[in-house]
């Protein structure tokens, strides 16, 4: 329990002879008493010894009774932590200026004037303001700052931080600006008062709206910094953002010329980044306030802003270099795209360390600070230029949702179900924009649902749908996402790479179909997710993985954050949405290394900046991005392939699989190198014993294990059949070394014909002539049957004459037998009573 007592310290000297105790008068409520002796007093600290303890408290009358003359400059607050059984404990001391005892009311206009000039500031928008009887003062009476711990590093000499080289200068007061430059409002344009769109054209062109709401609707608020370590701040509030999970929290408050970003992590100490105009000074609450006021830690003020960084994370979580970097963020640029570009870069690099959670802590703080600063930069840019753009609002909303998920899941190690984010920005109303978007999607005529628009338009529509989604996606948005993924899948069957627009469209389509939080009981959404995972895994062939990794390496090698924006959607790959975890195996890393010379610019950069071992390490980390993104997201796995977790099976949870292939509902193929504990198990022959491949067919209802026999037959040729005989089956190509190369779902009759064409196939994985003798293939049927793919029987053209009549009848008989065999494999091959026949639907 805690007890609080206020007494007066007579300065400059306290002696035993002139001790003064304050006793409640009869007029005041009886609150008990405490006696304390001041044993030592020095220029640096005070020490108190507890001689007696009784329950105590304080009220307004008692506090007012302490209001002495002007010669008494300070009062002290005694905070006692006492064991309720032994009445023994520790005593702490906090010094408060005496003027706090007199309520002081902040004088300000109810409405702030619009700033004068392009980058004008309001007159003193951020002002230190405190009153002992103000509700915001309560945190200072309950804080542990200076009692149980100190929020700042113990040595004030280290509070002054150097200004980073990237911080703003007098010649460059607003930092860098990316290309293309921010559009300006055309002459004679009448600006809307708020962001909205009534047609899809609003996404294709620049739509401007006024920033006047940021001034007319701003409210005066009080902010109490971290642990009450700095006196309260009044500011004109223009918005807030809250990102939370079970292991991390980022709270951002934005105002006119003001930002507070409180970043906390369950495994680390919290920090707070505060930005004020360069003319504003904040005062820290320290034990030295008797003699002089200290500014909180931070660099010298810049040409526009002053930055402070609070928290013991200053000297415990970070290196000095990292601390200086974070303090520079708000002054590096007022272009929000710059900060988001840096956040994406850090997030991508963080995924290469996803198996080493203790290393992600610093990345977590950096990304969180970048996210907060991007909101501040957009708010300030809009305020000072007096306008915003609709695409800026959509862009920021999608970035908040996506980066929050990556930040919390990979940076903080949070459970995905606990991740949430809310934004309340005065210059945009996501709820209103969501309703307008729903109306637009609702105007799509059913006859046009299957019509596929350009990838540019699809990307813009899906990006907006993802950004403004509130847990429920419009049925036509889901339909568009499905069509985009299927179209890209068909294209990747005959090529190895995607252009930037296709990658962006694929990113937003997959995010919509895979990452939903509401309606988990909706079987159609789960089916969408299973189909998406299967298609993404099928697109992630060995050849595509190599090209996608080269795209990422080029994106990072050529990264110039002062010119162009870098985002993860720009380098997105189906491998990042696949369920493959094997791409860090040596053969895939070596394939990437051998392909680097095919891109001369990248090859030159890598060999100029890195030695051979560093190049190999960079290649390995690039491939690790693919294995980390979706394949290790337990939320996605639990939602869409729950059968791999039944029967207390921890293999998937521990990542003990090479890949997962969803089959019919409730069943999946799992490929592993470990000994399976359940399921129908097939061991691929002629594979290196040190790198075995086991194909396991899992059912949600079966916990037993049984060995299956791989069929070795020539399959019937499907050319003369209208129906798709092999649709739903999966083609798997592997090497005798045990490496998995390609996984392709047979999705249509055209794909089936390409599979049967063998040496004439235009789909490279299907063509055996394009691979060596060490390449093998099997076909995985949806009912759990596995067949070695040797070839397809062709029925020859037969002349209808008596000489060949017998041969014709014999051929027909063989065809019937062949189709009977394949039908048995598709629907009737159940080796265990626990594995029932599964309809091919």
UniProtKB/Swiss-Prot annotation:
The record's account of how the chain is modified after translation: N-glycosylated, O-glycosylated, and sialylated.
Pfam families the UniProt entry points to:
Herpes_glycoH_C (PF17488), Herpes_glycop_H (PF02489)
Q: Which InterPro entries match?
A: Herpes_gH, Herpes_glycoH_C, Herpes_glycoH_C_sf
Q: Which UniProt keywords apply?
A: Fusion of virus membrane with host cell membrane, Fusion of virus membrane with host membrane, Glycoprotein, Host cell membrane, Host endosome, Host membrane, Membrane, Sialic acid, Signal, Transmembrane, Transmembrane helix, Viral envelope protein, Viral penetration into host cytoplasm, Virion, Virus entry into host cell
Specify the protein's topology with respect to the membrane: Single-pass type I membrane protein
- Identify the residue ranges that face the Virion surface compartment according to the record: 18-802
Q: Where in the cell is it found?
A: Virion membrane; Host cell membrane; Host endosome membrane
Q: Where is this region: Interaction with gL?
A: 246-309
Name the glycosylated positions.
18, 45, 217, 317, 499, 522, 760, 783
Segments on the Intravirion side according to the record's topology features: 824-841
| GO BP annotations listed | fusion of virus membrane with host plasma membrane; symbiont entry into host cell
Signal peptide: which range, if any? Answer: 1-17
What GO CC annotations are associated with the protein? host cell endosome membrane; host cell plasma membrane; membrane; viral envelope; virion membrane
Membrane-spanning ranges = 803-823
The free-text function statement in the UniProt record for this protein reads: The heterodimer glycoprotein H-glycoprotein L is required for the fusion of viral and plasma membranes leading to virus entry into the host cell. Following initial binding to host receptor, membrane fusion is mediated by the fusion machinery composed of gB and the heterodimer gH/gL. May also be involved in the fusion between the virion envelope and the outer nuclear membrane during virion morphogenesis.
Instruction: Kindly state the subunit structure of this protein.
Output: Interacts with glycoprotein L (gL); this interaction is necessary for the correct processing and cell surface expression of gH. The heterodimer gH/gL seems to interact with gB trimers during fusion.
Sequence similarity: Belongs to the herpesviridae glycoprotein H family.
Q: What is this protein called?
A: Envelope glycoprotein H
The lineage, from the top, is:
Viruses, Duplodnaviria, Heunggongvirae, Peploviricota, Herviviricetes
